[in-house]
């Protein structure tokens, strides 16, 4: 469905070779994450499906329904929270209203079963025992099972263990910093991601829809795992849309920019370095602890941004040539 929305065509009307090559490669690139998701039986595909439903309605100019679907996805898991930043940057007020409405429903719905007071107690307990008891810099989620920037900061700037191999705990500490400074670094990284989303939305707001809308959506999806404070392999099914996007741009030769292609290739290579099938358990864990996977995700986001610059520049030149043509 996402590919059909992105191209503005029915799936059956897309040339057979194109649709199968794009979807096969994108699915192959994310197969590791999908299999892990199915193995652990998590809700990440449901979250992804709700976001895609929201995007379907958004493409149909149904703003309120878009917000409600997106809001319910965030109510299940906060993974999709960066889309709030995206819609804020696009000034989609009705969508934001729908998100708030869905969030309110999700918070109050359990009250119809357990009562309002107990419902509030549950939410307070969750906030105190889960959110406040595990702050950035605590090192409690520093293992390589957590691929977020928050965990990377803990691994590099605290003495927390990075991974265990044959009963021995390994660390990759660069320098030990006070917990408060580590927390500041994590917050700054999240602000940097939010800023990047805003910059993309504002810079390319007048670009062709493939760039302004679908490129932006792919950009947000690619940064979602890094924005979250806890990101595990099953959560990475959300990378399917950005991989569909970059494979489509590459295969259909929408841009032949070498930098874009190098970034996509590096993204795949760095994420593959963390696979124990190729490098064994120890090396895969060590490379993950060093941040290879996080760098790979940043490369993917950079590739999408680079493609937007190249395609938008080419489109502006084409339009400029058309305007100047009749006068010469």
Would you name each region that the model predicts?
Residues 1-66, 92-215, 220-228, 233, ...:
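Primarily membrane-embedded glycan-assembly and transfer machineries that use lipid-linked glycans
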Residues 3, 57-62, 82-83, 108-117, ...:
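Juxtamembrane membrane-interface segments at transmembrane alpha-helix termini
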Residues 245-328:
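Aromatic-enriched
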Residues 45-50, 73-79, 100, 188, ...:
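Membrane-embedded alpha-helical segments of multi-pass membrane proteins
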Residues 71, 99-104, 216-221, 240, ...:
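Central hydrophobic cores of alpha-helical transmembrane segments
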Residues 66-71, 117-125, 255-264, 283-285:
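A cytosolic-side transmembrane-helix exit/cap motif
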Residues 232-248:
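Hydrophobic/aromatic-rich transmembrane helices and adjacent perimembrane loops
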Residues 64-77, 82-88, 220-227:
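Membrane-interface alpha helices of multi-pass inner-membrane proteins
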